[in-house]
């Protein structure tokens, strides 16, 4: 049997991010969508193990896409839940990340300019994907980037990400992605983002281990 991954518990109740993300969305997103990625990853890894034992090279090649897609979905969502927090627990409060805030202001000129740039990137995503603030290298360089479908961030440390798949917002916002992108700033966990930024600045990504 291959290593079995499990669905991580949410660090807050399903209704804790309202009114910005509804309880219904959170329950479906976590219990159904994320669980599906976990199940798919476990199944793909088991298929990989059996193919390796059978020396079935074509099968080994074909299963890689399922590992990438479902593994990426598991990584991305595990990071996503932790980079959100209820308002009453500090969600949306950039002052909880003084080091990161200073780096953002140095990179973009102001926090508001950074938010505008990030939202523009989010709304420019075609189809399904993620928007990320990442840090790259020991000098703490910050950049905004996107990943397609469930591809995870590689070559940099994700500081925080925003899920732009329709399942993350459609039941509440319909096709109004702009309102979803605007509202999610109220529940960004800046304390967690600060920890990730500092860890990434030191060249470590301990938060990436699942």
From Swiss-Prot:
Alphabetized PROSITE patterns for the sequence: SOD_MN (PS00088)
Primary location recorded for the protein, binned into one broad class: mitochondrion
Pfam (any one): Sod_Fe_C
Keywords: Allergen, Antioxidant, Manganese, Metal-binding, Mitochondrion, Oxidoreductase, Transit peptide
GO molecular function: IgE binding; manganese ion binding; superoxide dismutase activity
Gene3D superfamilies attached to this UniProt entry: Fe,Mn superoxide dismutase (SOD) domain, Iron/manganese superoxide dismutase, C-terminal domain
Binding site for Mn(2+): 29, 77, 163, 167
Record-listed E.C. numbers: 1.15.1.1
Cofactor binding note of this UniProt entry: Binds 1 Mn(2+) ion per subunit.
Subcellular location: Mitochondrion matrix
Superkingdom of the source species: Eukaryota
Entry's Gene Ontology cellular component terms: mitochondrial matrix; mitochondrion
CC cofactor: Mn(2+)
Record text on subunit structure and interactions: Homotetramer.
Function recorded in the entry: Destroys superoxide anion radicals which are normally produced within the cells and which are toxic to biological systems.
Family: Belongs to the iron/manganese superoxide dismutase family.
Protein name: Superoxide dismutase [Mn], mitochondrial
Native source organism of the sequence: Aspergillus fumigatus (strain ATCC MYA-4609 / CBS 101355 / FGSC A1100 / Af293) (Neosartorya fumigata)
